[in-house]
């Protein structure tokens, strides 16, 4: 796999599919007529959800939750997601069990476009995109 591209999500590879993840925002904080964009700037200083972001960062650890897409390892090609919350006790267990061998099994019987290409690059995809 070469070139620059954005990998949004591979079927069955999203942490949301584990049932341990949730995206959070407060619709009451959006300006009238503004739709949610789920962009990091919305959660940064000057953004609609900055105070929510500060509250989450301070309080989530007290309840075994974390923001897994905030301080990414330099080898990962995944964007920051300050809205993405993970329940650590279950997410860590799922993460330990999730491997490149699991995805092709999950895809059996499904019509996944590009599956052969994805399968041939699963090791690289896992090392660069799976958190």
UniProtKB/Swiss-Prot annotation:
Example GO molecular function: peptidase activity
Organism of origin: Haemophilus influenzae (strain ATCC 51907 / DSM 11121 / KW20 / Rd)
UniProt-recorded name of the protein: Uncharacterized protein HI_0100
One GO BP annotation of this record: proteolysis
Coiled-coil regions listed in the entry: none
